[in-house]
């Protein structure tokens, strides 16, 4: 008991103070001026809005999605908004070779990379699971595995720039919901994998931040169509959501929560988990590992 009072409680107090107050660093749009940013899934919805915000802030932007025609319009508008440069590379994230080559091409177009924003998903609809293994496999490959491939391809450039990785995920990656089992599984995988390698980067002194964005229902056309007649709740605005994601990435926050309900943030931002992670991390030794 005496040890807890004299050692453990002060440490936990300092940890909690850091956890809650470090997020209040001021964001300034000029932080993005001249930065080199990739945005995937950028032909519509949150991805497109992020590209537009980045353009207004004077960033270099490379966007990707499947639709060449739509991406051309996005790039044209980015240039009108003031992007330092804007390019598109069309392709599907079902193709891991494309995913890897896309990052290399984007890096050449911009002359490097400061921020990798991963936002794409495969098409999904709300329904009960009916033994569709193909859909589960496709969801895991596009929504999860391609994120890993893109990250691996981008890491050499991000290490040079001390850059940032931003993962756009979902409340469905932290709380189980019916009728989206494959989608939810892929989002749980994202949260587990990128939370884990964030710890590894810290332990190995890799100065690349990872921001996991946990989103509720957002008013994108895709989401509204999927939940129509099934889920009755108000959606948050995609324009504001996109800006909060960018802010979180620039400020190198570990997690961003965005939902119309304050309860979502309060209940999911779990300080006890952070304390447990901190305590567990003290028991690791990397002396015997071969890099």
Swiss-Prot record:
Glycosylation sites: 123, 162, 207
Residues that span the membrane, as ranges: 8-24
InterPro entries in the record: 11-beta-HSD, NAD(P)-bd_dom_sf, Sc_DH/Rdtase_CS, SDR_fam
Subcellular location: Endoplasmic reticulum membrane
Biological processes, Gene Ontology terms: steroid catabolic process
Recorded metabolic or biological pathway in which this protein acts: Steroid metabolism
Known tissue expression: Abundantly expressed in the liver, followed by fibroblasts, also detected in the brain, lung, heart, and ovary, and in smaller amounts in kidney, skin, and spleen.
The protein's enzyme class: oxidoreductase
Ranges facing Lumenal side: 25-291
Residue positions of the active site: 183
Subunit structure: Homodimer.
Protein name: 11-beta-hydroxysteroid dehydrogenase 1
């Amino acid at each position: 008991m005496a040890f807890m009072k004299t050692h453990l409680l002060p440490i936990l107090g300092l940890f909690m103070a850091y956890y809650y107050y470090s997020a209040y660093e001021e964001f300034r749009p000029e932080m993005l001026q001249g930065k080199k940013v990739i945005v995937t899934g950028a032909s519509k919805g949150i991805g497109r809005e992020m590209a537009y915000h980045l353009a207004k802030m004077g960033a270099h932007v490379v966007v990707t999605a499947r639709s060449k025609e739509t991406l051309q319009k996005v790039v044209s508008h980015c240039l009108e908004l003031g992007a330092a440069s804007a390019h598109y590379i069309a392709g599907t994230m079902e193709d891991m070779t494309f995913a890897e080559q896309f990052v290399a091409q984007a890096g050449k177009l911009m002359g490097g990379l400061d921020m990798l924003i991963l936002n794409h998903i495969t098409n999904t609809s709300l329904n009960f699971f009916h033994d569709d293994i193909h859909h589960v496999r496709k969801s895991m490959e596009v929504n999860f595995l391609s994120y890993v491939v893109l990250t691996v391809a981008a890491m050499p450039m991000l290490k040079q720039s001390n850059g940032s990785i931003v993962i756009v995920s979902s409340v469905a990656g932290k709380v189980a919901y019916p009728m989206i089992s494959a989608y939810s599984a892929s989002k749980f995988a994202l949260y587990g994998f990128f939370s884990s390698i964030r710890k590894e980067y810290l332990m190995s002194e890799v100065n690349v931040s990872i921001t996991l964005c946990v989103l509720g229902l957002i008013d994108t056309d895709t989401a509204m169509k999927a939940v129509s007649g099934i889920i009755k709740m108000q959606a948050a605005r995609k324009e504001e959501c996109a800006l909060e994601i960018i802010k979180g990435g620039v400020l190198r926050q570990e997690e961003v929560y965005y939902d119309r309900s304050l309860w979502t943030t309060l209940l999911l931002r779990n300080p006890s988990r952070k304390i447990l992670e901190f305590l567990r991390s003290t028991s690791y030794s990397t002396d015997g590992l071969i890099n």
